[in-house]
UniProtKB/Swiss-Prot annotation:
The keyword Cytoplasm is assigned to this record: yes
UniProt subunit comment: Component of a multi subunit autoregulatory ribonucleoprotein complex (ARC), at least composed of IGF2BP1, PABPC1 and CSDE1. Interacts with STRAP. Part of a complex associated with the FOS mCRD domain and consisting of PABPC1, PAIP1, HNRPD and SYNCRIP. The interaction with PABPC1 is direct and RNA-independent. Interacts with EIF4ENIF1/4E-T.
Chain positions found as N6-acetyllysine: K81
Residues annotated with Phosphoserine modification: S123, S276, S514, S584
GO cellular component assignments: CRD-mediated mRNA stability complex; cytoplasmic stress granule; cytosol; Golgi apparatus; mCRD-mediated mRNA stability complex; mitochondrial inner membrane; P-body; plasma membrane
Domain SUZ-C residue range list: 748-789
Annotated function: RNA-binding protein involved in translationally coupled mRNA turnover. Implicated with other RNA-binding proteins in the cytoplasmic deadenylation/translational and decay interplay of the FOS mRNA mediated by the major coding-region determinant of instability (mCRD) domain. Required for efficient formation of stress granules.
UniProt-recorded name of the protein: Cold shock domain-containing protein E1
Amino acid sequence: MSFDPNLLHNNGHNGYPNGTSAALRETGVIEKLLTSYGFIQCSERQARLFFHCSQYNGNLQDLKVGDDVEFEVSSDRRTGKPIAIKLVKIKPEIHPEERMNGQVVCAVPHNLESKSPAAPGQSPTGSVCYERNGEVFYLTYTSEDVEGNVQLETGDKINFVIDNNKHTGAVSARNIMLLKKKQARCQGVVCAMKEAFGFIERGDVVKEIFFHYSEFKGDLETLQPGDDVEFTIKDRNGKEVATDVRLLPQGTVIFEDISIEHFEGTVTKVIPKVPSKNQNDPLPGRIKVDFVIPKELPFGDKDTKSKVTLLEGDHVRFNISTDRRDKLERATNIEVLSNTFQFTNEAREMGVIAAMRDGFGFIKCVDRDARMFFHFSEILDGNQLHIADEVEFTVVPDMLSAQRNHAIRIKKLPKGTVSFHSHSDHRFLGTVEKEATFSNPKTTSPNKGKDKEAEDGIIAYDDCGVKLTIAFQAKDVEGSTSPQIGDKVEFSISDKQRPGQQIATCVRLLGRNSNSKRLLGYVATLKDNFGFIETANHDKEIFFHYSEFSGDVDSLELGDMVEYSLSKGKGNKVSAEKVNKAHSVNGITEEANPTIYSGKVIRPLRGVDPTQIEYQGMIEIVEEGDMKGEVYPFGIVGMANKGDCLQKGESVKFQLCVLGQNAQTMAYNITPLRRATVECVKDQFGFINYEVGDSKKLFFHVKEVQDGVELQAGDEVEFSVILNQRTGKCSACNVWRVCEGPKAVAAPRPDRLVNRLKNITLDDASAPRLMVLRQPRGPDNSMGFGAERKIRQAGVID
């Protein structure tokens, strides 16, 4: 469309108002604005007028759609249509502004390119809302209505002015100010938990964030490291912390993408077993991969499939993990290839699994005398090992103790691969010249130090008239009894894989040395299948198994004199063997001092208190005199009643006697002074008010009451205490009634029941009544009871 300004009916006017023109001027709003012309929407009437940009009095760059203008109306000379001339921009009126608080409902899209870039003034809009008098109102806004260089997001809290377009009547928001950004919810994984707080590994950046347990919205008992959570980040004291922590379904947060394809590479740097103080790299390991361009991938201690020790030069297979947050690549799911031992410089050894414990075990080595410790985590290929399995392994020093070795990288071998030695089928006879000892008896933990090195024993034997000697080890002895000096044994001779070495194996005891010394002792303790013997010096006890007793075990009683020999079993522990009953200790030949002393037990026998180290008990004289405070030992022989259980603190009377081969003065004929009252009597048993150990009542059976007396509650009694060796519980025996207790008097009816009976009103119609629905009858359908009811005395059975 062409336009000629000279065609306007302006009567020679220059087109610009000088303030003296009397022409009628109107107002309107720029509705459309193009490069050289535009259109105005009139405010006072429904009309849309064309105008040429040359008719605008001012900088055209400041004119935009929506601006208020003042103009005159003229007509196009050629077409006769009304047009606007002499345009002047009207300054906006200043109205009192009321600012409203609200929030963004729909944000203006960011980086949205206009489909018609040639059309200025057309920009995308968003919407906000506010509340007034319980109603919610929605307004539109554009990015130009936002103050400052701020990009609003949905949910942001804002403050704005309501603008009412007087020309179009449209209401919008302008002068928008951001009050508070919406708190974004982040996701992560709980990576550490302390006493009252923890840390979350964030899913958006490679960073950990602190959280306090009070911020967890849920059951804290169920929260554990590895759980997926979402949270809000807040700033407290200048530090970011996680708040409003909530659980997410497992698997929601994914940090990395793991390749499906497997790769192979070579370990160039291993993770140190003991990290240095300056070690800050969380992925210290390195694996070289032969891609088109060779590269090294890092890995950490959690990236291996198992805990098997990696060595430099190992050939491994792995996946590549790519972190979504920073795109860092690392090797993961690392497993050692079976052919890796061809490329490493390690010395491999062989052996057989000798023992298995909880999480660790021991290997009997082919080339070493000592058993080699190993941990289950060092087993390759996830195999489960059993005792006698043949294995191959590498020996390395322990990181915590250089003097101790252990086996790593254990590989299971086929049966028949390992051979310790070749031995002849011929059996030899010999005599033990030196006993063999173990190194560490009953080793259950690899952290226990060696108490004593193992020592080989020596066997003297005759081979074709030539007297020879050969070494043997305690582990090669068959049976539970170790041979002692002078014992006859049978054995085989084996050649170890290490050349030039012979050793006796499969050593079996044939007979004890007939000249072995026989000792006397006294039965001190009897358990289910073993017991202890008090030595002739009465200062210690010796273990013996019932299988070593010649005779009926049931005939053994505490205090019986026995004869025995000493033997060393596995673990260098001394025990009694070939136990024979001699004669009763009651016929003791030593003469006791006739003086009777009063004393107090200050230490019981070890059989009563197994926690104490010393076997002997101790009694202190408490009666006035020159000997008050003197202490004398005692054993099972010194007890008047061998089954009596003397406890610490009990009062006793005793005599003194010189006993034992070392002529020691000891307490003898010890009798406890116990007196207490009967707590209660049941049918066939009762309880005495006497404290024994943790129990404040002492049990007794009625058959233990002497002279057939029927005890009543409150009776004062004397008694002995015996210890059940099988159950470890004490009970009373030999119960004598010293004096009767007070007779039980029937207690009167309590006042509360008497008062209640007095207050019952039988005539009250509202009172609860008891109605008989069915009369009682006996089994034969008769009424009443055949036997007369009698008053029964408590504790007496008819």
